[in-house]
Amino acid sequence: VNFLRTLALGTRYTLSRHRRSKRMRDLAAANQAPISVLFYHRVADCHPNDWTISTDQFIRHVEYCREHYEIISLGEAQKRLQENCSPRPAVCITFDDGYAENMQSAIPWLIRNRIPCTYFVATEHVRHGRPFAHDVEAGCPLATNTIEQLRAAAKGGIEIGLHTANHVDFNTITTYQELESEIVDAKMDLEMMIGEPIDYFAVPFGMPEQMRPAVFEVARRCGIRGVCSAFGAYNLVGDDPFHIRRIHGDPDFIRLRNWLSFDERKLRYMPSLPTEDILVEQNLSERQDEADVVSSAGAVALANGDSLFVDSSLLQQPTIHA
């Protein structure tokens, strides 16, 4: 069934390629070119699963993006949306979770090629080396990044972002205190870990039910510049630039090309997000001052005395050929 679906999608892509190319040129001429933000989890050549892509596949994806699109940072993507000026079709590269294997090939390759990337991690999994629940349930508890690896990646130019403290499902959160712990406190912890300010936050799972109003509000109040979802959508001029919409870096190359070439059919099926959240009304005002105070406390604390020793060998890997 998957083979037939891929074949059908490939046929459709081939037949519509010229029309899509013209549409993309027209949008660019009007400064309305779409921005696609890709997210990956794990790049590795062992223990394959639904959230792992091989090294060769990943490099093929990025090389394709370099050839056909402009690869930009999340900050540049936001700037274009804020200024209502997107002159070229663009792509951003992001990672979620924080798997140790990413430091063996993918991240060093991105650094060597000076490709911007934002790398989202769950702080408690990094701090304690705790595997993710979904990996444990699958019988394969994969290693997570260490603090030293994150510091080395940041030193190499990779932007580190927040992915909560415990990879929590926000659809199950019932109190403001839980939300604050997973966003505000975790942001402060991560800033202390790496000695850099944290500007971006990726919501675990990132489906509409997790993208609650309280999540956006708490993130905004503690100094986060943008919140990333993961339900598959383009970023278009006129969209809210604080909400960065992302697309899965699908290992099936034809599906990836179909997304990046701007499939306007997908605009018809964009889900609506929750518009009401009792957490905002009940608890947010009484903790506003605390959230404002901690927005940069982590970076300040580290600057006042914590060590920033980086083991550069963590990122020294053999040359990878695309």
Model regions: which residues?
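C-terminal active-site subregion of NodB/CE4 polysaccharide deacetylases
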Residues: V1-T94, E101, T172-A322
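Short loop/turn segments at strand-loop or loop-helix junctions that form parts
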Residues: L38-V43, A122-T123, L162-A165
